[in-house]
Amino acid sequence: MGIKGLIPFLSEKVPSSISELSLECLSGESLAIDASAALYQFTIAIRDSSYFSSLVNSKGESTSHIYGLMNRCSKLLEYGIKPVFVFDSKPPELKSKTLDKRRQKREEAKTDFKKAISEGDKESAKKLVGRTVKVTKDMNDSAKKLLRLMGIPVIEALEEAEAQCAYLVTKNLCHFVASEDTDTLVFGGWFLLRNVTSSANKKIVKVDLQKVLDGLEFNFDQFVDFCILCGCDYCDTLEGVGPKTAYSLVKKYQSLEEIVRFKGGDYDEFKEAKDYFLSPKVNEYDENSVKMGTIDPEGLTEFLVQENNFSKERVEKFIEKLLKFKTKKIQTSLLSFLTNPQPTNKSKSLDEGPKQSSTEDYKVNTNPSTKGSNVYTTDTNSTKDTKGIECTATTTNNNLENKVKIENEENDTGRRDSIDDLFKEFEDETNLFEQDEFEPKSKEYNLEKQHELELNVHNRNVILIDDDDDEVLTTANSEKMNCEIGKVKEEPNKKGKFSLISIYIF
């Protein structure tokens, strides 16, 4: 469910915190995807058009989620997006009341759905079908099996997938959380992406936590209080309190305990919810856990064709596409570097910003059951032209305080001209990215001192990739529309070659 009414409230109160982007903009990113939310969407969207029933195999087992997973993963990989699917485990005890209410509503919806079908009321049946769906353990198991056969990372949450997704982002193992549940923000997920797994052609909605905090003038602790008061899965709501009232109360009292007691609620219950948001139970993972694995064509064929009655021709085409994606080489996408200035801690003061959670902030299980394996990635190219890139440079010696800004066209050091020449080769190549492959360009220059590059790309973002090892040398900042400074790798006092495989413009 997430936080009740949060998105409409933010759309009105802090519209700058919410933006739309296309799937292509996420090329090269790694997404921690809430698997249960994704499977739920697939199961609702892919149904028999006559009776709105889920697609099934010869054993009567649902396969709608498998169709959806295949199609969406294929699209994500096509754009060079690395999906990391995160699966729920046993929910916390705090959520039992919410789950009981959902179970009751689902049973009521099933009764109404059957009645609508028997009466031939397809319009009502279509509206009700989403409320009857439950993602089962068997569906989760079959989804995990498919993903592993595709070489896609599978992460097991200790409890809530949303908390585990936020953990992966705060540990910099993934760049964004993809979920429909807004409580990922309350768990500390830096960016929330919605509609990533939607089957419809919806624009992806990005919610920026830092902009939310800035716009509401909350520190992270106050934001958690506000969201709990709006309504969450872990405690009851206070009568007559929605987002607008919750906002006013937090502004006035700045204490969850004071607010709850003022409204006649049970503070112990609210405190438990807050403690869980601030210190959820998660499994600990490392970089190997989120690496892409190898594709198993034989295993996929057996699972999809023999076990689930998919068309052999369809499966062969699907595997062919996966292998094609694998043979392409990824250029590390940089939306995360361009847009994600990670905070350092959960703040008590507004100036400190929201939290980038460390391991200590979570109740961590250090022995999760699944780990990742080898990585493969795909190319992503932009067709925007590279004209107008301006380059300035600074030179530094080992004393970083001794920095000389090179501003003139001609200069005693000669550094400006050599670096400008390096980028000038790209200025007029407006069709550079229309071809699949191109020769990397390089410029040899004297490295008597260490160089730093600073690019001004105006309304565009740029990234430079080192030809030799695909190391990101520098990236632009999409908010300030300025590049961060990227240091040239070669050691000072040597002559070296600075190779670029690509300049990406976003």
Swiss-Prot record:
**Which Gene Ontology terms describe the biological processes this protein takes part in?**
base-excision repair; DNA replication, removal of RNA primer
| Amino acid composition bias (Basic and acidic residues), ranges on this chain | 348-363
**Does the UniProt entry include the keyword Mitochondrion?**
yes
Q: Which residues bind Mg(2+) 2?
A: D181, D183, D233
Q: Which Pfam families match?
A: XPG_I, XPG_N
Q: From which domain of life does this come? A: Eukaryota
GO cellular component entries: mitochondrion; nucleolus; nucleoplasm
The UniProt keyword set, sorted, is: DNA damage, DNA repair, DNA replication, Endonuclease, Exonuclease, Hydrolase, Magnesium, Metal-binding, Mitochondrion, Nuclease, Nucleus, Phosphoprotein
Q: Where is this region: I-domain?
A: 124-253
Where is this chain's protein located in or outside the cell? Nucleus, Nucleolus; Nucleus, Nucleoplasm; Mitochondrion
Cofactors required = Mg(2+)
Broad enzyme group: hydrolase
Q: Name one GO molecular function term.
A: magnesium ion binding
Provide the assembly information.
Interacts with PCNA. Three molecules of FEN1 bind to one PCNA trimer with each molecule binding to one PCNA monomer. PCNA stimulates the nuclease activity without altering cleavage specificity.
**Biological role stated in the UniProt entry:** Structure-specific nuclease with 5'-flap endonuclease and 5'-3' exonuclease activities involved in DNA replication and repair. During DNA replication, cleaves the 5'-overhanging flap structure that is generated by displacement synthesis when DNA polymerase encounters the 5'-end of a downstream Okazaki fragment. It enters the flap from the 5'-end and then tracks to cleave the flap base, leaving a nick for ligation. Also involved in the long patch base excision repair (LP-BER) pathway, by cleaving within the apurinic/apyrimidinic (AP) site-terminated flap.
User: So what family is this one in?
Assistant: Belongs to the XPG/RAD2 endonuclease family. FEN1 subfamily.
Task: Please give the name of this protein.
Answer: Flap endonuclease 1
